[in-house]
Amino acid sequence: MSVSDIETERTRYYDAYDADDAELDGFIVSDEENDNLENENRNERDPDSRNQDDVDEYGQPQIDRIRTMTEALAPNESQASKVLRAHISVLVSALGGPDHTSNISPPPYKLGHDALACLKDIKRWIKSVDDRQDSYQVALACAESGLVINDLIVILCQWDSKNKKKEDFRNKRTMEKIMLACLELLVLLTWSVELRPESSDKQKLLYYDVKKAQIKYKRAILTYNKGQTLKAVIRLVLPIISKERVDREPKDNAIMRLVLFFFRNILYVEPPSPSISKKSSKTIVVTDNMPEGVSYDDISLSATISAFSKNRVLMLFLTLSSGIGVDFDSRFLGPTLLECIHLLVRGVDPNDILKLKQMRIPTEINDPGNSSSPFHNVPPASSTTGLQLQDLLAKESKIKNSQTQSMSTRHGRFGSLLSIRGDHSMSFVVSGQEALINAGQTMQKLDRSKKWKNRSYFKYDSDEYTKSSNTTYMNYGGLVILHEFIESFLAGGCFNILIEKLSSVFSSSDSILEKEYETATFFLTIAWFFQYKREKTVLYSSGTTNLQPIGEEDDRNDFGSVGAALSQVNFILLVKYCVDSFSISPKRWSSLHVVLICLKELLEISNTLFTRSSSSAGDEEQNELDRELAEGIISHLLVTQDFLSILYHLPQTASRHSPEYLKVCISVVHILLKTLKNFAEEDVKLFIQTTRRNSKKKANKESNDQSDAVEQVDESDTEDKRTHARVTRERKINYERTEVKFFHQDTVSTYIEYLSRYEDLTHYEIKKCLTYFHRLFVVRKDFNGLYRLDFMQVLHKLRDYLPSQSNIRGQVDEFIYYFMKKFKASIERFPNPIEILFPRFEDAESKTYLATGELYIQTEREIRSANVKRFEPGKPLEFVRHFEDNEKYKILVSALYEQGLSNMLVCLVEDLQRIHGIKQLDEDVDEVLQLKEDFRQYVLTNSHLRLLLRTVGLIPGYSLSQECQVPSKLTSSDIDSAITLIKKWMGLQPATFEDGKDPSYFLRSTGDTVDRPIDYSDSEDDIAFEITPKDRPNESHYDMLTELDELERAISGAENREKGKARKRGNKSSSTIKKKSLQSRSRRPPRFNVDSDDESELRKEVKSSEFVHDSDDESDDEAFFEREERLRQMLNSSGGIVNAQQLSEFKKVWASLESTGGIATASQVVRAVESVANISDGVDTHSHQDDKSQPSDSENEDSSEEVSEVQIRKRLRIEDDENDSDNNVSENYVSAEEGEEATPTVKRKKRLVISDDEDE
């Protein structure tokens, strides 16, 4: 039970005594310590004033040996603690004691004159010191004084004996008050304590002592006079139960709940789990956590249940459960009563109870010497220690079998030493017989000898409500008693009544996480009884037993005895509990573990009923009822998309939590996939609710249509509500699409991690994993999903581990054979050995490329969804100058405060405090920032918040899917100082700066367009020079940057163009399309545009490293304009460039000119262009004469049309649109397809004529 629940319960029942606690304030005064301090100071000032008794005969100060020994034995005990123990001892002595003057043996207990006042004083001490100061000093003082064992238990048992004999008391009312005071102290002193990170240092120091004291209390309560204390406590509540509900007072209900608290505490007390550091050389001994003279058998669950049965405690539970909600207050008593039931069955396997049906119950258990009694059926180990020994022997036998399989048959007792020589002349030495089997065992032996420097710290954050500190062992007698109680509990309708009333209690609460422990107990109890009933149904259906258990009615084949837990209210509660636990930050993993356990049992019931109704040929009416119940369970569970999305996500992260959490996650996925498969085969239709926001336009239209008919009180509020109204609709579940989401690569990794623990798994659990992999690899044919090196290694190790005679070994061999057959074919067809080292990416582009080697073509729907607004990282900021940390936090907190994000700062501080607590326990742990969903967007988009996070030392992500990382190098002290500064300036808002300046005055942009790591691909270019803001508002920055890149590449000259071939010039529409394609390939992030095989070299472009220099202050404007002027003059002198030959020749000479940098060689360029033009004209004339389609005179006149300089520049763009230069199309011809004759097309020849006016 959590610490917060403990404090809440104590506060409820003992607030009435808070006024009396003032009497004890300042009661303990360490006057002696002050006097000693004054004497020491006086002696230091005047050494001669010391008392003669304080020095020995040699003049040296005498040593108080007794005091020194006391301080050495109890170094942590202060003088105030000693005084406190003395006061408690005085109160316990004044309470009473054995009356040795009496002739009765043993002597009866005689109460003191102020016994009631002493009990009240002790209770005030507990509340004033232990509760308020977070300590256990009073509790330990009571244990040392023997208050519980020597006084409270004896007083209650003596009072019960007198009431049983119907003896009269002098003051009956006072005696009842004393008994209630004794019960209150018992509840306080047996209340469960837990060691948590937030526990105080005093609590951590005294934790084990308190636990051992409580174990002594439990043993005394269960064994004193055969558990008469339990009967005495029940006697206190019997008069209240006999009253009518209307006649009971609030005090009566409080007493009933106090009694339930006492029984709950007795069930909850167990030994603390051993916690020895790995660095310690101390051997863990089981008895270290037990007090002297107490064994596990004295406080085991079997002993507790046996004592409860003898003293009618179980009968009290049945009575209260059957009358809850009618005779008893369900809200006041229901949760505590349910917790008692839960503690009775926690850790008990229902199969162990159901196995008793196959054996005859011994009638003479207390007569082991009777040979005629069937004691040969009773297990030989009937004690807790014996059962523990059986488990240990079974584990030892399993380990020995695995070792003998991996050892050679001959010379097994001799040692061996192997030398392995690897690459680079490295040699390794391996010793042991295991290394002689094969190479795999040799390398595995070598791997085990490695010592990893970076140790992984693993914490289990999901077992708070599901796992006890010790394994539960039940002997035969305890199982028989528990079986009888459970059958009576189910047959009498107590379970249905209790669950029905508690469902209404939880559904009426404001938040289901308000009482998280009670909610977890509720669903865990339901899950246990579901499992018990399901196993019993399967047992009777198989016909393995014909015995009729005691107290069982004809409820074998249906679930009527647990029908209340299958109500729609519980399904709604379960879904809400799951969604709330997952949505809150940080996530409640322990609650999600509880949800998965209950969900597993519900799916098991549904699958069992559906399979039985489909395969059974018996009563059709019963089969129809089973089918309806099975479909109803699934339809009520898979009711919302949010819940189904959580089920997709939980298995993806299950490997980060405890083995129990991982196991139940695997079971849920396995059963859910099996259920979906059965429903798909039977064509069962299920519908799920999806929600979407109503569009604002439609909402405004509806508002206008109804404005005349409905009077609007507050128009703005109504408009806002309608705008944000959520529309709920149902859609049919697509089983295939739903199934695909459970084959995510993270889920596959979870299964691989689970299978890697094959030594701890049963054959059935291994088969679950193989079924999953078979469905993914064989049925769905998703081969790349399992082409992973870690999976291959696990399969190899699993095959060597399994015995060759087992059935599961044959299934593993068949799967490995099929897997390697497909893998060899895939690696030969599409070699990608690097990809097997990592899990596959789940995006469609990566999956398509790895499977087929081709790029993914987006559908129209995906293109439309890609155009939806996406959040980009905020513009990076920096401080204008150097500031101290105090000033930095002042600026950033003030900026966020002015933006109205004060609530976000509060949430940030809370999560930083959570991280600070984790860092205090382990500095090397890696954590992530977990803000609320409403504020996660700001971590990406708000530049001020991103700078604040970096100032703290965090690493913000670059997308909504990336978490804000807390690096391991960030210490807890750094986080603590950051929290202090943020809190400081949050409390001083609005802050003032010098000259009344705004916080943003001290910040500036870093100049980067996007706050993300610079990682351009080969298809991206860098800007060689700055550009002015665009004049056309509809033109994107990508268009302008692409044009500048093309111009720069044309001027600089590229060497990819084949000599003698000009670039094809298309019409306006084709150029527009090409322009758009170039835009998508230039500056935008890669979107896996599909290119043909001829376009594979399209992205070989000039990088910006040619233009970027070390200094940003240097400008290349003068060189740029000088080069432009030279190009202009040469074009004017040569008369323009007409064909591909001229262009090619021009490029060559221009390249040499650029290399030499001489202006005088410009004439060479002109002569080269003119000579090539003359040759080209002859070729063109000859080709035109042979052409049938001779152009007209008007076309020839148009051919001499002037061409602008911009067109010439476009010709000079050196950016190939085709991959192979042989496939380039010249300006005068359009090549035909293979096998067809090429049809020449006449192109108009144009010359460039630039007048002097144009030149100016």
From Swiss-Prot:
> What segments bear the compositional bias annotation Basic and acidic residues?
39-53, 1097-1110, 1179-1190
Compartments where located? Nucleus
Q: What is any one of the record's Gene Ontology cellular component terms?
A: replication fork protection complex
Q: Does the keyword DNA repair apply?
A: yes
Biased segments, Low complexity type: 1222-1231
UniProt region (Disordered), positions on chain: 26-58, 695-725, 1052-1121, 1176-1256
Q: Which keywords accompany this UniProt record?
A: Cell cycle, DNA damage, DNA repair, DNA replication inhibitor, Meiosis, Nucleus
Predominant subcellular localization, coarse grouping: nucleus
Which Pfam families does this UniProt record tie to the protein? TIMELESS
- Where are stretches of biased composition, namely Basic residues? 1060-1086
InterPro entries xrefs: Timeless, Timeless_N
Tell me the GO BP annotations in alphabetical order: DNA repair; DNA replication checkpoint signaling; meiotic cell cycle; replication fork arrest
Q: Which molecular function GO terms apply here?
A: DNA binding
Q: Does the keyword Cell cycle apply?
A: yes
Compositional bias of kind Acidic residues? 26-38, 1194-1204
Complex and partners: Component of the fork protection complex (FPC) consisting of TOF1 and CSM3.
Q: What does the function comment of this entry state? A: Forms a fork protection complex (FPC) with CSM3 and which is required for chromosome segregation during meiosis and DNA damage repair. FPC coordinates leading and lagging strand synthesis and moves with the replication fork. FPC stabilizes replication forks in a configuration that is recognized by replication checkpoint sensors.
| Family per similarity comment | Belongs to the timeless family.
Designated name of the protein: Topoisomerase 1-associated factor 1
The record lists the organism as Scheffersomyces stipitis (strain ATCC 58785 / CBS 6054 / NBRC 10063 / NRRL Y-11545) (Yeast)
